[in-house]
């Protein structure tokens, strides 16, 4: 296994995407804009209901940190993804997709069991609501992760969705210890308002004594800090991280370090599907930082890539599209 720039740990999920009405969300007690965990039987029932009344848009490999890692790799970085899939057809599809994107994985990721699935429900306003059956990924532990590449990586990236699993939190703790021992920077995303609302203790455990870079959106930031303004939330989050990035949907993002706080405007696009947008932002931002770009440039690239993800269905772009967008962005920067 060769050295990598980014070492990420997260859930492995296959997405099934549907266009749905707001009424459908209400009828099935699904809180718009959040992720809700469920069991296999309940998800199967929802899937049946979706097939009967809603518009199917397709299947895609997902998982928040995996989407981030794909963006990072497709832009030109090197990456490893630690996860857990079942020894089934979906598990093979999932790992094959990562490998095709140039992301390193390990055979230890495959276990007896069922690969996790996520029903991604996209409402008319492009917001994504998710119902997730974690399957075997709920039991992700250090045993499924090869930590050797972490020792020489530049970044460890952790998704907040892992806050619901005790074994995953233990794996993250081990990863954090290795990262700190080898001078590897740590990035964490809060992932979802539902994680802040229902798994705060788990998030606190992932955050531990702080990180180098924290990603969140405006709602997550204010919920986690129990504040009513982005500015107050930012001030509190800076107590936990050297760099804080708060995304503001179409309005862009606020990025803050010990030296400066900047605000970068959004990019006007026709929003179709918000699924994976924040993940793409994080992957693009990390890639730009890792290649030596400043915060302003990193945020501008991240907004470009994430806005393209929003303008189509599915959590990821085609691999070649990331590279083309980067080329166009660099030409504009040099002009």
Residue ranges and their predicted role:
Residues 102, 135-142, 193-198, 226-227:
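Short gly/ser/thr-rich secondary-structure transition/capping motifs
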Residues 117-121, 252-255:
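Short beta-strand scaffold segments in enzyme catalytic cores
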Residues 108-110, 120-166:
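Conserved phosphate-binding/catalytic loop of the ribokinase/pfkB sugar-kinase fold
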Residues 79, 105, 186-187, 244:
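Hydrophobic beta-strand scaffold residues
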Residues 42-117, 134, 328-333:
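Substrate-binding N-lobe of the ribokinase-like
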Residues 155-232, 251-253:
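Conserved beta-alpha-beta core of the PfkB/ribokinase-like small-molecule kinase fold
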Residues 1-13, 18-19, 27-37, 53, ...:
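Conserved phosphate-binding/catalytic region of the ribokinase-like
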Residues 149-151, 207-208, 238:
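A short, aliphatic-rich alpha-helical micro-motif
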């Amino acid at each position: 296994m060769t050295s990598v720039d980014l070492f990420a740990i997260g859930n492995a999920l296959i997405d099934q995407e549907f266009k749905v009405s707001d009424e459908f969300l209400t009828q099935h007690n699904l809180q718009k804009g959040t992720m809700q965990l469920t069991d296999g039987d309940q998800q199967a029932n929802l899937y049946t209901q979706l097939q009967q009344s809603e518009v199917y848009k397709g299947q895609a490999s997902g998982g928040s940190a995996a989407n981030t890692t794909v963006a990072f790799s497709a832009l030109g970085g090197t990456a490893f993804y630690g996860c857990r899939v079942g020894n089934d057809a979906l598990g093979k599809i999932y790992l094959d997709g990562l490998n095709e994107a140039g992301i390193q994985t390990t055979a230890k990721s495959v276990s007896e069991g069922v690969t996790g699935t996520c029903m991604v429900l996209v409402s008319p306003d492009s917001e994504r609501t998710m119902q997730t059956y974690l399957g075997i990924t709920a039991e992700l532990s250090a045993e499924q992760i090869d930590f050797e590449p972490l020792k020489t990586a530049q970044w460890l990236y952790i998704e907040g969705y892992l806050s619901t699993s005790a074994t995953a939190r233990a794996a993250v703790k081990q990863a954090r210890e290795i990262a700190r021992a080898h001078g590897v920077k740590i990035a964490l995303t809060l992932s979802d308002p539902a994680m802040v609302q229902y798994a705060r203790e788990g998030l606190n455990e992932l955050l531990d004594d702080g990180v180098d870079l924290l990603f969140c959106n405006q709602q997550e930031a204010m919920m986690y800090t129990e504040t009513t303004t982005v500015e107050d939330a930012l001030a509190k989050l800076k107590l936990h991280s050297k760099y804080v990035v708060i995304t503001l949907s179409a309005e862009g993002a606020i990025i803050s370090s010990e030296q400066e706080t900047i605000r970068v405007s959004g990019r006007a696009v026709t929003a179709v599907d918000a699924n994976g947008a924040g993940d793409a932002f994080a992957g693009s931002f990390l890639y730009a930082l890792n290649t030596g770009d400043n915060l302003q440039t990193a945020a501008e690239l991240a907004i470009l890539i994430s806005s393209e993800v929003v303008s189509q269905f599915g959590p990821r772009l085609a691999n070649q599209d990331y590279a083309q967008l980067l080329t166009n962005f660099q030409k504009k920067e040099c002009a």
